[in-house]
C-alpha cells in the first residue's frame, strides 16, 4: 500500500533483501541490461524506493535502508538511500501517476499493453491480455 489508502496497492517482486538483525536493511536488484544507472539516476529511481516503502510497511524498527543495484554485465554496483522526504515524494508521485491512468481509463481512454523483449522477465503473464498462460522464461 502507498500510505494507508487501499486504493493504492502495488505488487512487485524484490530480487533480494538483507538485514543485519540490528535494524539495517539492504534491498538489492540485479540488472542484466546493457546500460548501468549513474549515481544521479539511481538517486532518483523509484523502483527500489517503492520496495523500500513496502518493507517499511511490513517491518518495524528500521534504522536504515540501503538500495543497491548490481549491473551484471559491467560488474558494478550502485548504492543509494532515501530520506523520509524522498519517500513521501515517491509516494505522492506514484499516487498521481495512478490517478492519471485511472482518469484516462474512466474517460474512455486506452492503456494498451505493449509486447516487448521485457515481457520475458515479467511475472504477470497470466494477468496480461497480450500473453497466454505463465511465463516460460521464469521458473517458480
Residue ranges and their predicted role:
Residues 1-140:
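RecB-family 4Fe-4S metal-dependent nuclease core
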Amino acid at each position: 500500500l502507498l500510505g494507508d489508502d487501499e486504493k493504492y496497492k502495488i505488487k512487485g517482486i524484490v530480487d533480494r533483501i538483507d538485514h543485519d538483525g540490528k535494524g539495517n536493511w539492504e534491498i538489492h536488484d540485479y540488472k542484466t541490461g546493457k546500460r548501468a544507472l549513474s549515481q544521479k539516476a539511481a538517486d532518483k529511481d523509484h523502483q527500489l524506493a517503492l520496495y523500500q516503502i513496502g518493507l517499511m510497511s511490513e517491518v518495524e524498527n528500521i534504522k536504515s535502508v540501503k538500495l543497491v543495484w548490481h549491473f551484471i554485465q559491467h560488474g558494478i554496483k550502485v548504492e543509494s538511500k532515501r530520506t523520509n522526504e524522498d519517500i513521501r515524494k515517491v509516494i505522492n508521485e506514484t499516487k498521481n501517476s495512478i490517478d492519471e491512468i485511472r482518469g484516462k481509463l474512466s474517460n474512455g481512454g486506452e492503456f494498451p499493453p505493449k509486447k516487448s523483449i521485457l515481457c520475458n522477465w515479467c511475472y504477470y503473464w497470466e494477468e496480461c491480455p497480450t500473453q497466454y498462460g505463465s511465463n516460460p522464461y521464469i521458473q517458480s
